[in-house]
């Protein structure tokens, strides 16, 4: 009798994706982040579901309902902080996953890469709307500032903003719809992740060397299942350390003050994982220009495969490109730092330089470095 996991229509899909999947024998720990993102997503959906059971999306009670969850609901505090810090872990894994893709040339799978970009945008939208729900000062003003950016759209801008708000300011209608979208989007992310995986399994995984590995494949189970379990344990260890020892480390103290439309916080800033994009937005004095730069800071990933000029796929054997890659990492860390600083000298100048360098690296310097490396190999 044939094994049921190989014959049953549903079990067969799972078997071909997680058990008998042929995987390259040399993929490193940088390939763990796909499974870690899956774990993060499931964790966020589960904790979010339990939070939604007690949360009320009304401007008068939203802040109180979150307080109620933390004070009165059984283990509500841990669910709330696991959800809030789970988002941070999610984005850490996301950035490392994208960074891995850039370094090892995984973007040469165009369908997988493009679905990944859509996933990144969707996750950022979900996180933004989730940040609005506790209805603290930073929630309210963050929502006001970011949605207001759409008013930069020529001709229809103002109408567009009021349509999203459901009125003439961020109010009850805005909060209710943000809650509805924040609830549904993770399930859309789940579906997109399945498509992401589907496209990946059409080609098979890339590997650190960037060389086709068809001649040297090993079964996913038990080798990579046990490796993923180790990654998952480390992820949960980091998350729970954060949740149990310093749950508010990555949050903003202003969000413990209920939203007040009459009092603006001294420094409006988003969560840490949006600071790099926020810094790019603020670096451009023109409103529409800033909004375009903000969108392009992520959308630029879509042109990376088109600008791949190297004869090699991976950066593993390309020292010049490696230097530029790590310069890009340092640049993004600089932008993250600048995004959290007030708009004054010298932060404005540093932010503008870092923003220019970011686009220069991806659009100009890296493709040129690849061409230089190609010519060096001909000597």
Swiss-Prot record:
- What is the designated name of this protein? Cytochrome b
Gene that this sequence comes from: MT-CYB
Q: What else is known?
A: Heme 1 (or BL or b562) is low-potential and absorbs at about 562 nm, and heme 2 (or BH or b566) is high-potential and absorbs at about 566 nm.
Gene Ontology cellular component annotations, sorted alphabetically: mitochondrial inner membrane; respiratory chain complex III
Q: Which family does it belong to?
A: Belongs to the cytochrome b family.
SUPFAM superfamilies according to UniProt? a domain/subunit of cytochrome bc1 complex (Ubiquinol-cytochrome c reductase), Transmembrane di-heme cytochromes
Q: What is its main location?
A: mitochondrion
Give an example GO biological process: mitochondrial electron transport, ubiquinol to cytochrome c
Sorted alphabetically, which PROSITE patterns does this protein's record hold? CYTB_CTER, CYTB_NTER
Subunit structure, as described in the record: The cytochrome bc1 complex contains 11 subunits: 3 respiratory subunits (MT-CYB, CYC1 and UQCRFS1), 2 core proteins (UQCRC1 and UQCRC2) and 6 low-molecular weight proteins (UQCRH/QCR6, UQCRB/QCR7, UQCRQ/QCR8, UQCR10/QCR9, UQCR11/QCR10 and a cleavage product of UQCRFS1). This cytochrome bc1 complex then forms a dimer.
Topology relative to the lipid bilayer, per the entry, is: Multi-pass membrane protein
State its cofactor. heme b
- Binding positions (a ubiquinone): 201
Q: What does this protein do?
A: Component of the ubiquinol-cytochrome c reductase complex (complex III or cytochrome b-c1 complex) that is part of the mitochondrial respiratory chain. The b-c1 complex mediates electron transfer from ubiquinol to cytochrome c. Contributes to the generation of a proton gradient across the mitochondrial membrane that is then used for ATP synthesis.
Q: Which residues bind heme b b566?
A: 97, 196
Localization in the cell: Mitochondrion inner membrane
Q: Where are the transmembrane segments?
A: 33-53, 77-98, 113-133, 178-198, 226-246, 288-308, 320-340, 347-367
């Amino acid at each position: 009798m044939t094994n049921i996991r190989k014959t049953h229509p549903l079990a067969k899909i799972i078997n071909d994706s997680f058990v008998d999947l042929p995987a390259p024998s040399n993929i490193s720990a940088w390939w763990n982040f796909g499974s870690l993102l899956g774990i993060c997503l499931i964790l966020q959906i589960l904790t979010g579901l339990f939070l939604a059971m007690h949360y009320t999306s009304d401007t008068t009670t939203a802040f109180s309902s979150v307080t109620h969850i933390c004070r009165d609901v059984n283990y509500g505090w841990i669910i709330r902080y696991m959800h809030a810090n789970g988002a941070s872990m999610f984005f850490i894994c996301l950035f490392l996953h994208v960074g891995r893709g850039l370094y090892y040339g995984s973007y040469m799978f165009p369908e997988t890469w493009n679905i990944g970009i859509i996933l990144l945008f969707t996750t950022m939208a979900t996180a933004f709307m989730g940040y609005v729900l506790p209805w603290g000062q930073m929630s309210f003003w963050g929502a006001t500032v970011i949605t207001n950016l759409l008013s930069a759209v020529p001709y229809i801008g103002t109408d567009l903003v009021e349509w999203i708000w459901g009125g003439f300011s961020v109010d009850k209608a805005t909060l209710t719809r943000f809650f509805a979208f924040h609830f549904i989007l993770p399930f859309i992310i789940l579906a997109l992740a399945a498509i992401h995986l589907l496209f990946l399994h059409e080609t098979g995984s890339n590997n650190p060397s960037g060389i086709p590995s068809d001649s040297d494949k090993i079964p996913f189970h038990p080798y990579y299942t046990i490796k993923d379990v180790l990654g998952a344990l480390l992820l949960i260890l980091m998350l729970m350390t954060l949740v149990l020892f310093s749950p508010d480390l990555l949050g903003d103290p202003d969000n413990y003050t209920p939203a007040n439309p009459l009092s603006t916080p001294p420094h409006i800033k988003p969560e840490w994982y949006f600071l790099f994009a926020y810094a790019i937005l603020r670096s451009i004095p023109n409103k529409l220009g800033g909004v375009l730069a903000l969108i392009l800071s992520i959308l630029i990933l879509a042109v990376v495969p088109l600008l791949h000029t190297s004869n090699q796929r991976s950066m593993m054997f390309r020292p010049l490109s490696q230097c530029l890659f790590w310069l890009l990492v340092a640049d993004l860390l600089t932008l993250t730092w600048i995004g959290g600083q007030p708009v004054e000298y010298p932060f404005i100048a540093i932010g503008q330089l870092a923003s220019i360098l970011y686009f220069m690296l991806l659009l100009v310097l890296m493709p040129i470095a690849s061409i230089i490396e190609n010519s060096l190999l001909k000597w």
